């Protein structure tokens, strides 16, 4: 069994989603949001994110963490803040010796919905379906669960390829 923590980083709200994977089946564990204080300095917000991720790592002991890659904002200041939030989340996970993988928004949507330009409500719907939830989680938590699901799909896709063929190269016949 593998426990995967998905992280949707943000300087105000960082979503998290935990799933367990066993025999190529996934199940929901927990999800939610780490909300930082609106009036806090950036350094204190980053500390809140770090502490929140460390708490999750201590409580659930995930061995693998998946996080969304940074994308360009129209506002460079927002992109920098997002980069800081992402960085402290990665440091918190790395300090607990977790394997960290990064995925683009397009890869996540493609993996979960089957369409790389899917809308957020489509992603949320598929998270509910795939994890058999009674209702949709909060927006940022749903995104984090989608990131964890993407990681599960990617790691299983690669292990299937490696497992079925090994590392032996085969000659293609024309």
Swiss-Prot record:
One of its GO terms (molecular function) is magnesium ion binding. SUPFAM superfamilies: Ribonuclease H-like (SSF53098). It catalyses: Endonucleolytic cleavage at a junction such as a reciprocal single-stranded crossover between two homologous DNA duplexes (Holliday junction). One of its GO terms (cellular component) is cytoplasm. It holds the Pfam family RuvC. Its cofactor is Mg(2+). Its EC number is 3.1.21.10. Keywords: Cytoplasm, DNA damage, DNA recombination, DNA repair, DNA-binding, Endonuclease, Hydrolase, Magnesium, Metal-binding, Nuclease. It is found in: Cytoplasm. The active site is at 8, 68, 140. Signal peptide: none annotated. Mg(2+) 2 binds at residue 68. Binds 2 Mg(2+) ion per subunit. GO terms for biological process: DNA recombination; DNA repair. Its main location: cytoplasm. NCBIfam families: PRK00039.2-1, ruvC. The RuvA-RuvB-RuvC complex processes Holliday junction (HJ) DNA during genetic recombination and DNA repair. Endonuclease that resolves HJ intermediates. Cleaves cruciform DNA by making single-stranded nicks across the HJ at symmetrical positions within the homologous arms, yielding a 5'-phosphate and a 3'-hydroxyl group; requires a central core of homology in the junction. The consensus cleavage sequence is 5'-(A/T)TT(C/G)-3'. Cleavage occurs on the 3'-side of the TT dinucleotide at the point of strand exchange. Belongs to the RuvC family. This is Crossover junction endodeoxyribonuclease RuvC.
């Amino acid at each position: 069994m593998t426990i995967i923590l998905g992280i949707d980083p943000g300087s105000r709200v960082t979503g998290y989603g935990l799933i367990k994977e066993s025999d190529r089946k996934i199940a929901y564990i927990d999800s939610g949001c780490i909300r930082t204080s609106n009036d806090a300095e950036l350094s204190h917000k980053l500390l809140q994110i770090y502490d929140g991720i460390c708490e999750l790592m201590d409580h659930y002991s995930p061995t693998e963490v998946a996080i969304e890659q940074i994308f360009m904002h129209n506002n460079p200041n927002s992109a920098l803040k997002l980069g800081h939030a992402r960085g402290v989340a990665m440091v918190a996970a790395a300090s607990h010796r977790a394997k960290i993988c990064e995925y683009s928004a397009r890869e996540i949507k493609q993996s979960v919905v089957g369409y790389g330009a899917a809308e957020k409500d489509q992603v949320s719907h598929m998270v509910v379906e795939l994890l058999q939830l009674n209702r949709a989680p909060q927006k940022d938590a749903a995104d984090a669960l989608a990131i964890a699901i993407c990681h599960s799909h990617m790691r299983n896709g690669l292990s299937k390829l490696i497992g079925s063929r090994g590392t032996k190269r085969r000659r293609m016949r024309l």
